Amino acid sequence: MEGRGSVRGKVARREEGKKKKKAAADWESVPIRAFKTQKDFADWLEKNHSKSAGIWMRIAKKDSGKKTINYAEGLESALCYGWIDAHKRPESESTWLQRFVPRRPKSGWSKINRDKATALVESGQMRPAGLAEIERARADGRWDAAYDSPARAQVPAEFLKELDRNPRAKAFFETISRINRYAIIWRLQTAKTAATREQRMRTFIEMLEKGKTLH
């Protein structure tokens, strides 16, 4: 048993090493760009939205005294051209980096970004590329299936009922972190069918009953 466990451990460490190398390569391969204004970013997207795989946007911290586009402005322009925000990274004492990338096929919409996109359409700012992403999402159901952001996410009522039937799982659920709580909510909200949602609920109840989490 020890031998097998040792082999598993080596394999796991090897895979983790590969992931770190890939992340490092990803970091180095994506260009860093700075834009002073929202118009500068919009002009860049007009020329590059269909041929760029994404960028790291350098954004100045509020108290830095530097002038750059801010995150909210960047997100608005990104949505207009069918792009979306991804993760962020610290860079220096005065700046941080926000990743913006083209929206992947079939990627889910958050309710916040759906509302922002709707407002951009109504104000006449939405560009053809962004409108095409909205139309695709409406056609395949992703628009109506938009999920809550972490700040607004509520535990689905049917999952609360399942928790009430399992005191042990419920007690552990009440102790888990906000990240783990949202991970469960997000997976339930984004289930494409009722059968998938029910299966996920059963899986999560069993997981919580054993004192385990997704992260």
Predicted regions and their residues:
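Charge-dense, helix-prone N-terminal extensions
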Residues: 2-215
